């Protein structure tokens, strides 16, 4: 009689300990978040021609970057969206991405970076 009840207790404990206790697990488990495609960040700037690179940074190819200006106000909305986003094509600097010609931006700010210069891709031959 003790064996069946012991087996039931062990199965019950196993079921309880294998549950996910983290309340904000992504659908499909913890590793599923790595498989998701990053969405493009919100459009910003004049005519919506730019993309957000941080909560107060908006960059557009033709216009350059706006940091802390009215053009970048829309970028603050990214803080309230549940999924991460990514702007820019090529990684650069320390956790940044190329925003415009010669400019590398991360959520912390922008700086010049020769890796983002479109002419440098052709001059390295």
UniProtKB/Swiss-Prot annotation:
Q: Which residues form the signal peptide?
A: 1-19
> What is the protein's name according to its record?
Oxytocin-neurophysin 1
- Summarize the protein's role: Neurophysin 1 specifically binds oxytocin. Oxytocin causes contraction of the smooth muscle of the uterus and of the mammary gland. Acts by binding to oxytocin receptor (OXTR).
Chain positions with Glycine amide modification: 28
Which Cys pairs does UniProt list as disulfide-bonded? 20-25, 41-85, 44-58, 52-75, 59-65, 92-104, 98-116, 105-110
Record's keyword terms, sorted? Amidation, Cleavage on pair of basic residues, Disulfide bond, Hormone, Signal
Q: Does the keyword Disulfide bond apply?
A: yes
Answer yes or no on keyword Disulfide bond: yes
Coiled-coil ranges (or none): none
Family assignment from sequence similarity: Belongs to the vasopressin/oxytocin family.
Give any single GO term for biological process. lactation
GO CC list: cytoplasm; extracellular region; extracellular space; neuronal dense core vesicle; secretory granule; terminal bouton
Q: Which GO terms describe its molecular function?
A: neurohypophyseal hormone activity; neuropeptide hormone activity; oxytocin receptor binding; V1A vasopressin receptor binding
Q: Which Pfam family is one of this chain's hits?
A: Hormone_5
- Encoding gene (name): Oxt
Q: Please describe the quaternary structure of this protein.
A: Interacts with oxytocin receptor (Ki=1.5 nM). Interacts with vasopressin V1aR/AVPR1A (Ki=37 nM), V1bR/AVPR1B (Ki=222 nM), and V2R/AVPR2 receptors (Ki=823 nM).
What domain of life?
Eukaryota
| PANTHER family reported for this sequence | NEUROPHYSIN, OXYTOCIN-NEUROPHYSIN 1
> InterPro entries attached here?
Neurhyp_horm, Neurhyp_horm_dom_sf, Neurohypophysial_hormone_CS
